[in-house]
Amino acid sequence: MSIFALQKIEAIKGKQEFDKLVVDGKCPFDEFENSLESQYKSELAGIYHYMQDVADLKSVPYAKFHFYDEGKNGVREFEFKSKHLRVYGITKSNGKIIITGGTKTKQGTEQNEFRKLKNLYLASLMRKK
């Protein structure tokens, strides 16, 4: 059974909180970020800019940020996008939880991994109740 925690994303400060999911002491989003080739660093900076806009409750183009679903149990899936990068997460009552990231070329596989982590995390919350 995995142990989950949330860690605040210090670079994002706004009306909404932005956290990243930590699984068994490792953060999938940090691992994604650290594995990026240098040519994609500017795209990731752009995604951080859109995260800040969302945290500040500003309007963001649908092509850069959108929800995937209507939400179950008050939790909705979302995606931040750039030309080559994707960042996946879910909503929480006072903000967003970033779960993982990926590239456009592998997005099918990475969406499956995102949903697997999301479901495990949500199941862990239900066990705590």
Predicted ranges, named:
Residues 1-46, 129:
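Arg/Lys-rich, positively charged N-terminal/basic patches that mediate binding to nucleic acids
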